[in-house]
């Protein structure tokens, strides 16, 4: 579905409090990937998940699961919109929504605006369709607010040319840069893209990421003259994840334990521990 460097990028995004939306058509694997990436959220974070059907498992200690309820009438029903509004009063560090479909998107943007990252799935097959749905009726997000959403992951079920089998792949990972009111256009950077011929992921490379250089590097205290360090951090995280796969560490909770060690001692030190043969996923 996704390779190590793209996974490492999502790790940096989620750990740093960026809002990431997993988008695609029906049965494209959106919820599965969202659920898998929850291990990248900071271990001490307070997380609220909101769903119609409880599917998402969050391994964190400070996790509150909220589920909608269908009553006999509108007064006894509890909708996503209601839970999302109520969640803001609980001051979460992260809000996870199973799927955003309608008016609750407006509340999600309010949450992101006040500093609560929202991680969710959304039915859209491209960045253009995502923006079109968000800015059109009935959601009607103002165009100038769109860059409050940091990152859009576009997924699809695809038939591989080499085998003819149906697989799920991330088609692209995109950074939302902003809205140009003069040109009336939205600017975004396709940082990762999937090549169907080779079934590999293409990363645009150093110097191409708006979020890494202008948000996350600053948050981590990296000055502009040393901005290459954020790409080195990305590379270290990718190698760390590759080593876990090489050692057969595929269980969700084992990966979570390994990521927690990396959070505690630093990714570079955790990588050294793995290379020395330490089984940090058993800690």
Where are these regions (language model features)?
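Switch/coupling sub-region of P-loop NTPases
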Residues: 3, 7-26, 32-158
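Short, Lys/Arg-enriched charge-dense amphipathic segments
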Residues: 43-52, 71-75, 118-125, 149, ...
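Conserved P-loop NTPase
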Residues: 151-241
């Amino acid at each position: 579905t996704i390779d190590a460097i793209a996974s490492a990028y999502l790790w940096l995004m989620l750990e740093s409090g960026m809002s990431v939306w997993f988008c695609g058509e029906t049965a494209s694997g959106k919820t599965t990937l969202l659920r898998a990436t929850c291990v990248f959220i900071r271990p001490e974070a307070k997380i609220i998940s909101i769903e119609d059907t409880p599917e998402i498992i969050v391994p964190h200690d400070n996790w509150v699961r909220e589920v909608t309820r269908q009553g006999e009438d509108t007064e006894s029903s509890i909708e996503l919109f209601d839970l999302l509004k109520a969640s803001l009063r609980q001051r979460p560090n992260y809000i996870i929504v199973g799927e955003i479909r309608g008016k609750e998107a407006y509340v999600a943007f309010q949450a992101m605006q006040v500093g609560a990252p929202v991680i969710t799935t959304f039915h859209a097959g491209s960045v253009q369709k995502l923006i079109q749905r968000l800015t059109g009726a009935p959601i009607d997000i103002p165009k100038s607010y769109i860059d409050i959403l940091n990152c859009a992951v576009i997924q699809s079920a695809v038939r591989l040319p080499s085998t003819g089998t149906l697989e799920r792949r991330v088609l692209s990972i995109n950074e939302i840069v902003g809205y140009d009111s003069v040109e009336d256009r939205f600017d975004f950077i396709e940082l990762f893209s999937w090549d169907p011929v080779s079934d590999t992921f293409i990363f645009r490379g150093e110097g191409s990421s708006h979020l890494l250089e202008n948000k996350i590097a600053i948050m981590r205290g990296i000055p502009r003259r040393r901005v290459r360090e954020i790409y080195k951090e990305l590379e270290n995280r990718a190698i760390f994840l590759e080593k876990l796969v090489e050692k057969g560490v595929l269980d969700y909770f084992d990966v979570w334990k390994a990521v927690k060690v990396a959070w505690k001692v630093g990714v570079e030190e955790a990588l050294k521990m793995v290379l020395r043969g330490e089984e940090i996923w058993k800690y």
